[in-house]
Each structure stands twice: as structure tokens, then as C-alpha cells.
């Protein structure tokens, strides 16, 4: 990658970082609080332009606005010595230095990654690539994104698109960077709170940096790893980890209250909108957060909290309704394959009890694996939250209300999950993608707990009668205890850092080498054979053998051809057209090709079943041939062997 290409890829990142630094200086907030506002604003800003099918205009306008604001804020910092001094402090702050280090680390680790998993290839990786290539709304028959995937909200794909929009070529690894970057910037507020508290406590040296590093490593890497393992952030493109972290950030801001200034309200507003734009289930978190803020507010701040909650809820509902309206306009149905019905409260209760018996967290130790069920995780997290409030002399009743809100949100998520997937659960007695979906709730709770710990950890060592220091002072081994705690914190930080780096280096989306090579071979054959132009060229891909085994081969081929104006028209379930698969006859197959307006049909291989069942339309072909391409002739209702000269 030459310097020009590297700069084009990193230009949006540099723009976001510089603007956040200047914004934190102008508004007098920490960099860790400013960077989430900037990144979330990118998604919120681009969404109306995407809905209006003017994504390119929105991207250019956003870049211009950020550049103009950066120039204006820079001039202000030069003219005002107070702002200049504040900027220098922010540049030298621990949160900014940790941010720079984590960004460099993510750039290094994501450089050579490829999109490989199922949902990543057909949705979370394909969506941003389609936006980068065509810069058009991916809804309706003209979209390259499959119809079954079009109902997914475009929040994260829009962010991925902006991060790569100034590059001359699409980089798969930068998708992983964007996902990891999104998680990191949401952890920065926690890191900054810790650094502020420790500075006020006059802590210096290795302990100060150990605390900041400890919170960054635990929050950004260790917690998601415990929940998601091989399906977590930095190694996959699943949206559930970012959704859980954003939900935790949103709840933390809402519980903080809207009476302490405009920043908490703006943070809640942007994060609430982005929750709805990240995934459908984000609507539950968005509504629960503002309701929790209203329930937990005291009499003094009740009016401001109610007004702030009403504003956030209104914005969330407007965005949600606008997306539903778009889906209706383009006749895009929900990706669910069944109607949602009420099964009865007894069935729901039975389901919840069964779910409570499943494992939510797995800890792989040297000689054993410890599995912790979902209710145990909930009780541990909520118990720690209440215990933290007790020892830090915080308002215990308010903390009890917050814990109740979080518990009710988790239960509502479970019940909603049952309504959505009741068909597959009843038929197969299984819980599809349970660990990923439910992991969002656990990750949200863990974030709130870590945020509380960061806010109140100085209270744990403060001069409170119920504080830990009061207990420590009664001990004759006070000095030894404090010294052991310091060294233990440093040692734990080192171990977590090493383990986390090993996790990121070793954790990768995996695809078998034959599938990867064959997908590239199929894509190259199509590129060198079919005629392409500004209009999409539709190809029906036939793969001999079980369609489920060939799922990733189909998806990878589809993904590689997105930016080449070639669309694999059929979904993976119809790649096997023989009697062992879809069971088409020759006439039915021709009818399907014509009805789907396919320009070409490609056989990745000619098996004996394909040869015998479709010999009347294949013409001069032999068993064992690979990458055989035919042009679809709608007038003569036939397919003709095609070789581009």
C-alpha cells in the first residue's frame, strides 16, 4: 500500500480524531467523552442522506463540515491562550495516548484479515462493500444486497462506508478495524473517568498508568472475549458485541442524568438513535434506557430528566418509523420467515426457565472449562453493582432501582427473543445464535458495572465509614494489603494484556483453503468471461453438492464480485439444482432464469447428476468440467455456451 492509498484510508480516521480533540478543547470536556460523540454523529449524519439515496453527497458534505469546523476551532485555539493551554493538556492526557496506542494496534492487527463467516459475507461485510461501490440505497430489486438481508438497519455499514469512502480500493481488513474502533471509543469514557479520579487522588507513577491500562484492557477486550469467544469483536463482523457495548454506554449516560449539562443529553440522544440504527433489538435498549432514567431520577432533577427522556425517545421513534417507512415503500419484508404470534404466557414462562439453564459465559482454563449460566451471570453482575454502591456510600435505593431496570430489560429481551424465534425453537427445540444475541445483554450489564466502578472507585478508597479504607485502617496489615493490591493490579494488567493480544493475534474468521481458492477461481472466470458495464450483470451460480456445505463458497464468490458489477442472483439454498437439491427440471430451471432476469448461468462444476438431469439444455459439455458459463437467451428459452473472445 503506497502512501497515497494509506492516507486515503486513514483520512476519515484522522479527521474524526482531530475534530474530537478540538471539540473536547472548545467544550471543555475530556477527549474520551468527545470521541464517541463524533463517531456516533457520523452515523446519525449519514443516515438521512442514505434514506434519500444521496449517500455520496452526504459523505462529501460531512467531510467538508468536519474540515471547516477543525479549521475554525484551530484558529480559536491559536487566538486564545486559554484554549491553547487546554489543547496541550488534552494531547498529553492519558486517554488520548491510550487511544492512539489502541488505534495503531487495531490498524496492525486488521491489516491482513479477510471476510469469511456466513453473516459477514452476505451482510455485515457485503453491505459496506456495496455502499462503497455504488453509493446507493440498498433496498428493492436493484440492490446488490440480498432481499432477505435488506431489512437490517444500516448503522454500522454506514460507519464502515465512511471510513473507507476516500480509498481507491476496498480493504476487507479495514472493516475489522472499524468494528474494533467502534468498541474502543466507547470504552474511552471509562478510561478517562479513571484517569481523572486518580489524578485528583494524587496517584502517580506505575499505579496511575496501570489503572488506566487495566480498565482499557478489561473493558475493550477481556469482557467481550469472555462472552463471545470466537464470535467477538476484532475477529468477526457480528454486530452483537458493538450493540452490547453501545447499550451499556447508553444506559450509563442515562443513569447519570440529564441535569448536569448538555453533554449527557447529546450523548444519550446520539447513542439512542444509533442503537436503533445498529440492530432491530436496539429499540428495546433505547426505550428501556430513557424509562430507566425517568424512574431513577430524584425530585430535584425530575423535570429536566423527563424533558430529556422525552426528547431522546421522540428522536428514537422518528428514526425507527423512518426506516419502517422506507421498507414499506420498497416492499422489503422482515427477514423472519414466519408470523409472530402470542403463544401464551405458560409457553413464554417455560421458555424463560429453559433459557436460564443454558450457559452464557465460558471460561477456558488450563485443565478445565467453567460454564456459567445466564441467571448466575445476572445475579453476579447486579450483586456487584449493589455491593459497589454500598461500599462507596452511594445512594443505595437509586442503585437498587437501576439494577431492577437492567434486570427487567434482560427479561424483556428474553421474551422478545422468544417471540421472534418461536418457530425454530418449537420445531427444533433449539436456541439459534443464543450466545451472540444474549451476549449483548450481558455485555451491556458489564459495561454499566465497569462504568460505575470507574466513577466510584475513588469512593472505595475514600474517607467513608463504609468505605474500604475504613476497613483497611482497622487492620494491622494495612501497608502490606495496600502494597499487595498495587502489585497485584499491575501483575493482573500485564497478564490481561498478554492474554488479550494472544486472543486477537490467534482469533480469526476461518474459511477452508479450498473454498477460498475456488471462490477466487470462480470470480476470476466470470470477470474474464462475462460482459459487464455500468448496469449490474446477474449470474445464477450452480454448485454441485449439498447447498449447506457450499454456503461459504457461494457467499465468498458473491462477496468478491460485489465491486465488479456482477451480482450472484440466487441465494445459497438454490445452488444445487439437481433432484437431491432444489429438484428443478430443465424447463423449470429455464423459467427461473428468465423470471429472475439472469444474464448468465455458471456451473462451478459439472457433476454426473447435473450432466444426466440437464443434458438436454447443457449441450456439448462433459463431466468434470469446471467454471462452465452459459448466456441466458430469453427469446429462445435456452442457455448457450458462452466464451468471451
Show which residues each predicted segment covers.
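Perimembrane helix-loop-helix junctions
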Residues: 82-89, 285-312, 567
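Active-site lumenal/periplasmic loops and adjacent helix-entry segments of GT-C-fold
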Residues: 103-212
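Membrane-lumen/periplasm interface segments of specific transmembrane helices
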Residues: 112-115, 298-385, 410-411
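Membrane-embedded, lumen/periplasm-facing catalytic core of multi-pass transferases
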Residues: 331, 487-559
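Hydrophobic alpha-helical membrane-interfacial segments at the cytosolic entry of transmembrane helices
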Residues: 91-106, 270-271, 296-324, 402-406
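Membrane-interface alpha helices of multi-pass inner-membrane proteins
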Residues: 46-50, 264-280, 286-291
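Hydrophobic, aromatic-rich transmembrane alpha-helices
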Residues: 17-25, 183-201, 294, 369-400, ...
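Membrane-embedded, hydrophobic transmembrane alpha-helices
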Residues: 1-88
Amino acid at each position: 500500500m503506497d502512501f497515497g492509498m494509506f492516507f486515503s484510508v486513514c483520512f476519515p480516521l484522522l479527521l474524526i480524531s482531530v475534530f474530537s480533540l478540538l471539540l473536547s478543547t472548545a467544550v471543555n470536556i475530556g477527549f474520551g467523552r468527545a470521541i464517541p460523540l463524533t463517531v456516533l454523529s457520523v452515523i446519525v449524519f449519514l443516515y438521512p442522506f442514505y434514506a434519500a439515496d444521496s449517500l455520496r453527497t452526504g459523505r462529501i458534505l460531512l467531510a467538508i463540515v468536519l474540515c471547516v469546523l477543525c479549521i475554525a476551532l484551530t484558529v480559536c485555539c491559536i487566538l486564545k491562550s486559554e484554549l491553547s493551554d487546554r489543547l496541550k493538556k488534552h494531547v498529553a492526557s492519558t486517554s488520548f495516548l491510550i487511544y492512539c496506542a489502541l488505534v495503531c494496534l487495531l490498524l496492525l492487527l486488521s491489516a491482513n484479515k479477510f471476510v469469511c463467516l456466513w453473516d459477514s459475507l452476505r451482510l455485515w461485510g457485503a453491505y459496506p462493500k456495496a455502499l462503497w461501490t455504488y453509493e446507493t440505497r440498498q433496498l428493492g430489486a436493484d440492490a446488490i444486497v440480498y432481499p432477505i438481508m435488506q431489512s437490517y438497519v444500516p448503522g454500522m455499514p454506514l460507519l464502515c462506508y465512511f471510513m473507507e469512502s476516500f480509498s481507491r480500493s476496498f480493504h476487507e481488513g479495514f472493516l475489522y478495524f472499524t468494528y474494533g474502533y467502534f468498541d474502543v471509543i466507547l470504552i474511552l469514557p471509562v478510561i478517562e473517568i479513571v484517569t481523572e479520579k486518580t489524578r485528583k487522588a494524587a496517584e502517580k507513577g506505575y499505579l496511575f498508568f496501570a489503572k488506566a491500562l487495566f480498565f482499557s484492557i478489561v473493558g475493550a477486550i477481556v469482557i467481550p472475549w469472555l462472552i463471545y469467544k470466537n464470535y467477538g469483536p476484532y475477529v468477526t463482523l457480528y454486530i452483537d458485541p458493538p450493540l452490547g457495548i453501545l447499550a451499556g454506554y447508553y444506559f450509563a449516560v442515562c443513569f447519570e442524568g440529564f441535569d448536569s449539562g448538555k453533554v449527557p443529553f447529546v450523548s444519550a440522544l446520539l447513542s439512542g438513535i444509533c442503537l436503533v440504527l445498529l440492530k432491530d433489538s436496539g429499540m428495546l435498549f433505547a426505550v428501556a434506557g430513557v424509562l430507566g432514567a425517568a424512574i431513577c431520577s430524584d425530585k430535584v432533577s425530575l423535570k429536566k430528566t423527563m424533558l430529556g427522556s422525552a426528547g431522546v425517545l421522540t428522536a428514537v421513534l422518528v428514526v425507527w418509523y423512518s426506516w419502517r417507512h422506507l421498507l414499506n415503500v420498497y416492499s422489503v419484508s422482515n427477514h423472519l420467515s414466519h408470523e409472530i404470534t402470542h403463544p401464551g404466557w405458560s409457553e413464554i414462562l417455560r421458555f424463560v426457565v429453559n433459557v436460564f439453564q443454558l450457559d452464557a459465559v465460558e471460561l477456558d482454563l488450563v485443565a478445565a472449562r467453567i460454564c456459567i449460566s445466564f441467571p448466575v451471570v445476572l445475579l453476579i453482575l447486579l450483586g456487584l453493582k449493589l455491593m459497589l454502591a454500598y461500599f462507596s456510600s452511594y445512594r443505595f435505593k437509586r442503585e437498587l432501582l437501576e439494577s431492577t431496570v437492567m434486570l427487567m430489560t434482560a427479561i424483556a429481551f428474553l421474551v422478545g427473543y422468544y417471540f421472534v424465534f418461536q418457530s425454530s425453537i418449537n420445531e427444533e427445540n433449539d436456541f439459534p445464535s443464543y450466545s451472540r444475541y444474549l451476549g449483548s445483554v450481558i455485555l451491556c450489564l458489564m459495561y454499566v458495572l465497569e462504568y460505575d466502578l470507574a466513577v466510584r472507585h475513588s469512593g472505595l478508597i475514600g474517607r467513608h465509614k463504609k468505605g474500604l479504607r475504613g476497613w483497611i485502617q482497622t487492620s494491622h496489615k494495612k501497608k502490606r494489603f495496600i502494597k499487595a493490591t498495587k502489585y497485584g493490579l499491575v501483575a493482573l494488567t500485564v497478564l490481561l494484556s498478554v492474554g488479550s493480544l494472544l486472543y486477537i493475534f490467534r482469533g480469526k474468521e476461518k474459511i477452508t483453503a479450498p473454498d477460498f481458492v475456488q471462490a477466487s477461481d470462480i470470480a476470476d472466470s466470470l470477470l474474464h468471461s462475462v460482459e459487464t458495464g455500468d448496469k449490474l450483470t446477474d449470474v445464477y451460480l450452480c454448485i454441485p453438492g449439498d447447498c449447506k456445505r457450499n454456503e461459504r463458497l457461494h457467499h465468498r464468490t458473491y462477496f468478491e464480485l460485489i465491486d465488479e458489477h456482477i451480482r450472484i442472483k440466487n441465494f445459497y439454498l438454490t445452488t444445487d439444482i439437481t433432484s437431491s437439491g432444489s429438484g428443478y427440471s430443465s424447463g423449470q430451471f429455464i423459467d427461473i432464469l428468465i423470471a429472475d432476469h439472469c444474464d448468465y448461468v455458471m456451473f462451478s462444476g459439472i457433476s454426473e447428476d447435473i450432466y444426466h438431469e440437464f443434458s438436454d439444455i447443457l449441450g456439448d459439455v462433459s463431466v468434470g468440467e469446471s467454471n462452465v458459463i452459459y448466456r441466458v437467451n430469453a427469446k429462445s428459452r435456452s442457455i448457450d455456451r458462452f466464451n468471451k473472445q
